[in-house]
Amino acid sequence: MKPKILFIMHMPPPVHGAAMMGQYIHDSRLINEQFECRYINPSLSSSVANVGKVSLGKVFAMIKNILNIVRMANNFKPDLCYYTPTADGWGIYRDLLVVTLLKWQKRKVILHLHNKGVKSFSERHFFARLAYGLIFKNTNVILLAKELYPDIQRYVPISRIS
């Protein structure tokens, strides 16, 4: 029986770095042969111009997306949930909700950060500091580059970095 992974990651559209990495993972024959995989694209934007903009349609899509993630985690029962959170911006509160719901279901969560922004956003917003603390608590983190570690060292010990 192959280990099960639920990938919650951005894939195109829109096309940007994290979405391209998500597409590479999704299309990887090695990953798909070694693991039983399910994929959920949490993206709410169809173009780069819409990234970071809030609309009523996006709010409803986000709720639907979160319910889909919870349902998939409950039914598929993955051994691991791979999640690509936003590094900065108000999307961290969505990430907090998703990661918390996965942890409540006793799912092992690994986060993959693709860029910086955690430190600067948390320094400017008190509730962001609390959110990041909860998001990173008891999770392992994959960093795209070791130079990203100072951005999250306040929240994640080096022993939980891959």
Locations of the language-model features?
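A short, histidine- and acid-enriched strand-loop-helix "catalytic/donor-clamping" loop
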Residues: T86-G91, R107-H125, N140
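Donor nucleotide-sugar binding/catalytic pocket of nucleotide-sugar-dependent glycosyltransferases
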Residues: A131-S162
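A short helix->loop->beta-strand "cap" motif at the edges of active sites that frequently abuts
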Residues: P3, Q105-V109, T139, I158-S159
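Structural beta-sheet core signal
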Residues: F7, Y39, Y83, L111, ...
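Active-site charged/polar residues at nucleotide-handling catalytic sites that mediate phosphoryl
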Residues: F76
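N-terminal subdomain of nucleotide-sugar transferases
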Residues: M1-S45
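An aromatic- and histidine-rich active-site surface loop
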Residues: N65, L80-Q105
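A short, charged, and often flexible helix/loop element on the N-terminal side
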Residues: N41-R71, A87-R94
